[in-house]
């Protein structure tokens, strides 16, 4: 193999098997796709050691992808329960799964996830450094942080979140700034604490070139995390957030010089009127790199319903150019999600992604809706269920309330508008009584 990474291959004019797979899935010209990868506007996270991967592309002119978070923790360390979540995520066709494990047999779990998953796998090595090493945060060395990152790469993780933009100068602004929620990124807060406890610069920032060595060797995509993402709408689009984004833009260029693929992570909590400006800022400051957002959640008052607040923001964000959505479940801010929460979160994220794809005129997006509309006009219930984003729920709802006439539902019965117009146009007897 005479290339190191997907970006290196693209710049050398080589079309990889992963590019061919993505081209077929997306119905886009493979040479146009290669050009987008070469200039950093599309990434194909594909670790050389992830043998079960079915490659996906993230970025310009492609379908918006969704990610599912899971993993073992001190309070919920049942590996089998989390592996069942992996199976559900795969069955529901999530394109990415992030293992956020931070306690116990993290490597054993990670290896199983990579082995069984055709979805691209992401991780946050910072979490693992604390849980796996079983050391006090202050005592973890820079070399140990790098060793954990290398282990994740060896194990086949396709993309890693690192909070390299949280520099000492950014931290100083956080300390001087009147933020309501300070740092809500778990990895970011751990790094902030390490820096303060050791009175040192961010080790992920100072060792960035060594991390690029690892990513280049295994073709790991960098997901540059936003440690300073807003945790409430009051903190959104402030100086702290933007200062970190500027640093991420600089790091993006450094990664590209080494042919390492990059995504940029984004908010977070954000009022709906600020979403478009934030997408424009990321695309400008980070040179068109794919944008990966958590939400954004457009209001802070809805615990138990944050899959909805997230879907509202996510749909608008995608419409304005976001490329990748991290799902949010009804359990957000409350507890670890269970399987039902997961399913709700996946469906909400998929709806938001699809709504955004319609606005972006992504190939095939509108056709799906048109087929559903045709099935409704024809009162073809079997076809409606087949096309539904959640066929199981749609069929269950209909079965729970069976109409007298099979060509209608219990909302309108014989007064169904589709039924009425269809009968009139076909010169059939109407019979509303």
From Swiss-Prot:
Name of the protein in its database record: Phosphomethylpyrimidine synthase
Keyword Lyase: yes
Enzyme Commission numbers on file: 4.1.99.17
Cofactor: [4Fe-4S] cluster
Any single GO CC term annotated in Swiss-Prot or TrEMBL for this entry: cytosol
Signal sequence residues: none
Stated role: Catalyzes the synthesis of the hydroxymethylpyrimidine phosphate (HMP-P) moiety of thiamine from aminoimidazole ribotide (AIR) in a radical S-adenosyl-L-methionine (SAM)-dependent reaction.
Keywords, ordered alphabetically: 4Fe-4S, Iron, Iron-sulfur, Lyase, Metal-binding, S-adenosyl-L-methionine, Thiamine biosynthesis, Zinc
Reaction(s) the record says it catalyses: 5-amino-1-(5-phospho-beta-D-ribosyl)imidazole + S-adenosyl-L-methionine = 4-amino-2-methyl-5-(phosphooxymethyl)pyrimidine + CO + 5'-deoxyadenosine + formate + L-methionine + 3 H(+)
Binding residues annotated for Zn(2+), in chain numbering: 269, 333
Residues holding substrate: 69, 98, 127, 163, 185-187, 226-229, 265, 292
One BP term from GO: thiamine diphosphate biosynthetic process
Molecular function in Gene Ontology: 4 iron, 4 sulfur cluster binding; carbon-carbon lyase activity; zinc ion binding
NCBIfam families named in the record: PRK13352.1, thiC
Family: Belongs to the ThiC family.
Sequence positions that bind [4Fe-4S] cluster: 409, 412, 416
Enzyme class: lyase
Cofactor note: Binds 1 [4Fe-4S] cluster per subunit. The cluster is coordinated with 3 cysteines and an exchangeable S-adenosyl-L-methionine.
Pathway note: Cofactor biosynthesis; thiamine diphosphate biosynthesis
């Amino acid at each position: 193999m005479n290339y190191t990474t997907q970006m290196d291959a693209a710049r050398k004019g080589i079309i990889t098997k992963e590019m061919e797979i993505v081209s077929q899935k997306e119905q886009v010209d493979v040479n146009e796709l290669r050009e987008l990868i070469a200039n950093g506007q599309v990434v194909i996270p594909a670790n050389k050691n992830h043998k079960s991967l079915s490659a996906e592309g993230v970025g310009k002119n492609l379908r918006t992808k969704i990610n599912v978070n899971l993993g073992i923790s001190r309070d919920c360390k049942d590996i089998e329960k989390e592996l069942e979540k992996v199976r559900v995520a795969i069955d529901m066709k999530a394109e990415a799964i992030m293992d956020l494990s931070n306690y116990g047999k993290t490597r054993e779990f990670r290896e199983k996830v990579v082995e069984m998953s055709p979805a691209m796998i992401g991780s946050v090595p910072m979490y693992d450094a604390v849980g796996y090493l079983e050391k006090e945060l202050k005592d973890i060395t820079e070399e140990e942080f790098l060793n954990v990152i290398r282990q994740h790469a060896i194990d086949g993780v396709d993309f890693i979140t690192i909070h390299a933009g949280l520099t000492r100068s950014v931290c100083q602004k956080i300390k001087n700034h009147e933020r309501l929620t300070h740092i809500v990124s778990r990895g970011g807060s751990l790094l902030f604490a390490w820096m303060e406890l050791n009175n040192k610069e961010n080790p992920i920032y100072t060792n960035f070139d060594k991390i690029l060595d690892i990513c280049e060797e295994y073709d790991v995509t960098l997901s540059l995390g936003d440690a300073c993402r807003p945790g409430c709408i009051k903190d959104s689009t402030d100086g702290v957030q933007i200062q970190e984004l500027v640093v991420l833009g600089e790091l993006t260029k450094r990664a590209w010089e080494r042919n390492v693929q990059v995504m940029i992570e984004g908010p977070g909590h954000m009022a709906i009127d600020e979403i478009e400006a934030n997408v424009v800022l990321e695309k400008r400051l980070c040179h068109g790199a794919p944008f990966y957002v958590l939400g954004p959640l457009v209001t802070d008052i809805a615990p138990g319903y944050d899959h909805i607040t997230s879907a509202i923001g996510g749909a608008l964000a995608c419409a304005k150019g976001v490329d990748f959505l991290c799902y949010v479940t009804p359990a957000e801010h409350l507890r670890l999600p269970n399987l039902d929460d997961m399913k709700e979160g996946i469906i909400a994220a998929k709806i938001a992604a699809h709504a955004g794809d319609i606005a972006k005129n992504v190939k095939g997006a509108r056709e799906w809706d048109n087929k559903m509309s045709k099935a409704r006009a024809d009162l073809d219930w079997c076809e409606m269920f087949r096309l539904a984003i959640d066929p199981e729920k749609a069929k269950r709802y209909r079965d729970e309330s069976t109409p007298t006439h099979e060509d209608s539902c219990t909302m309108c019965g014989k007064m169904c508008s589709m039924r009425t117009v269809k009968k009139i146009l076909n010169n059939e007897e109407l019979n509303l009584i």
